[in-house]
């Protein structure tokens, strides 16, 4: 699936280049900075991420306000990288609404020990994905060479 995502990115950049354009990201705060549900140098390889600071629910509200087609708004979330009908939520193990609830509680400083049993399960899923994908959410580390070692 990562290879498909990276080939998709290459295709998007090809068309952006020949059309003197940019590649616009579709990742939201839950996907990009919550659980890191994207492919590094694949669908995460974009020039601008206009909705990356919006929770998924906020993206839906904005989309409805803009009059986006209901068929699109109600579509099952999928990355389209598999040859079956698995959804994002099937792959993640939790639904986006619950992941967003967990993220909001964490942002408010609430203690996960106080979450109900279902949200505790989602918190565990969120934490597992967040920790495993944290490398995607930080800038590429730079190795600074001391001046006395430079040629």
Question: Where are the regions that the model predicts?
Answer:
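ATP/NTP-dependent adenylation/nucleotidyl-transfer catalytic domains that generate, transfer
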Residues: 1-6, 10-22, 26-151
């Amino acid at each position: 699936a990562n290879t498909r995502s990276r080939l998709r990115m290459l295709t998007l950049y090809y068309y952006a280049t020949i059309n003197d354009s940019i590649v616009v990201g579709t990742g939201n705060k839950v996907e990009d900075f919550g659980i890191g549900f994207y492919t590094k140098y694949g669908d995460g390889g974009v020039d601008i991420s206009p909705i990356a600071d919006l929770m998924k629910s906020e993206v839906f509200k904005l989309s409805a306000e803009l009059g986006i087609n209901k068929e699109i708004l109600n579509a099952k979330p999928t990355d389209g990288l598999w040859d079956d009908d698995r959804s994002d939520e099937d792959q993640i193990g939790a639904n986006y609404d619950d992941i967003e609830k967990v993220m909001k509680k964490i942002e408010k400083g609430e203690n996960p020990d106080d979450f109900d049993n279902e949200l505790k399960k989602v918190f565990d899923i969120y934490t597992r994905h967040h920790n495993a994908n944290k490398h995607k959410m930080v800038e590429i580390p730079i190795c600074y060479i001391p001046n006395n070692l430079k040629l």
